[in-house]
Amino acid sequence: MFTKPIIFVSFITIPIVSLFSAPKYILFGWEFGQTKLHELIEKAPYFDTLPIDGIGITPLTGQKDAIGRPMWSRYLMHTGPWQHEDVKPLVEDFRRLTSHKSMKECFFGKFFSSPTNRIAWTDDAVWARIGQNMRVLARLAKEGGVRGFGIDHEDYFRQEQFRHRRSDGDYAKTASLVRKRARQLFSGVFAEHPTAVIITFWLLSQEEIYFGEVDPVVTMRDRGDLWPAFINGIFDVMPPTAKFVDGDEKSYRYRADRGDFERAYVQQRTKAIRLVAPENRQKYMTLASMAFSVYLDMYLANEGDEWYQPPLNGSQLERLRDNLRGASFASDEYVWFWGQAHCWAKWPEKRRFNGHFKQEDFKRTWEECMNGLIDTIAQVKDPQAYGFKLWEESKKRGALKVMNRNSACLDDARKKKALPSPYAYWQDTYRRDTNGVFRIDSTFGEGDTSSICVEGVSHGSVILPIKGVQSGDWYAVEFSAFGEGVSGDVGWYKNSKWYKASGKVAVVFEDGVAKDSWRKARGVFRVPTGADGFGLIMGVHLMPGEKCHLDNVFVYKLEKEGVEK
């Protein structure tokens, strides 16, 4: 689960899009621009086994326009005009594709992209044709269950579509016209697909040059930048049911251990908004979602390469894990992956490939190149779901390893303190008026006649310490409680002292069980980097005269099948 604090900018509250849900992971890459629609449908069951929610698709459909030119988003800027009847036969195929759980968050890639030849902003006919094509694909997306559209306006063909030229005329008038064109294009899109999500590899996150300026509008004019005007035009016509996602492509280079993702999130919210017209700022705050990216090729690169992420604890996969964790924590809803040299799936025929890579590269999957990648992504995406699934699988194959002594909370005549080994206890007598009692009750227990009894402790805990663990190992804990005022969590040790560099993990009680009966609390977790032990903390918060009982305390080490040590 990923949460973040609510930030206040002036008087506007930033909405948290997915406060209590796992992030949505979207795959983009060269392989998906070379794939036929029927191939995607055939591979969808395989993608269902991956911890993903969708892909950016520009599949080859085989559809042609009236004069035989390919009809798909990558050709949208320079073909058409298209008609809905031209793509209507594809609706059922897209419904089949998006019926899969791994395809619920698919995006039409290259929906609006940089043109191969610069288009005059004054050319009404061309912009009308492009708008018609976009509207046709928007309707197809809505009817086919596709979540939305990808915008990639990077200037691959060096046409400077969003850079003002003197031949355009006055900058202010041109910027106004650009904003009008965006309204013209996207009013039709939202009319056909009012709940569309527009994901951009960058919305305003790349405009850092303006963030420190006293008057960014003046700087935009001096630089001839027309992109913010286009974005404002989209916001002009965006309904409250739609969403804009800033993918922050420069986050390829971010490092979680430097706090880069959190810094970028705050910067996007507090600085980028100055590039948004005042009348659209409320829309920006409520409809714009912040996302971050993972560039897979960087984790296979060699030191000295332009695109490179250094290893963490000797492993580039661990660096990917840490950065993915940072991206997932800081994003509002989406994290997207970009890959070039390899593929997620084995495809049935040779793919076209960029000259930077060998054809052989495309025969290897990312998992083959980074063993454990898919499992790592699953762990980061939803640690609780992953851990509980691993726990259940271990139970089924009888592989649970109990790591603690005295789970039954039996008395020990040799004990020198109120509770027997290995249990410790604590109450805050320094800052609170508490003077309760910890003891073994040999007359009452869950399934037997022994348990730990706590009486009158207003703020304290019973602690089960576990030492000698390794970072990256998975554990499960459970205990039973009778009575009110009991909570559970796990904290970390380093060199036998509390280690607070990583946050605690909650151990949660099952719902729907009366507090005048035994209740079970459970938790799962991965040991964080730097920790060499942990403590299961069974917290107690009792009123005078109240008591509670604790029993059946278990700590299990969890390991995937085939890797038990």
Spans of model-derived segments:
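Bacterial N-terminal signal peptides
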Residues: 7-16
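Positively charged n-region of N-terminal signal peptides that target proteins for export
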Residues: 1-5
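Extracellular and organelle-lumenal recognition/adhesion modules and their flexible linkers in secreted
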Residues: 392-565
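Single-residue recognition of alpha-helix boundary sites
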Residues: 15, 179, 562-563
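Glycan-processing catalytic domains of CAZymes
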Residues: 22-397
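Short, solvent-exposed coil/turn linker segments
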Residues: 15-16, 36, 70-71, 83, ...
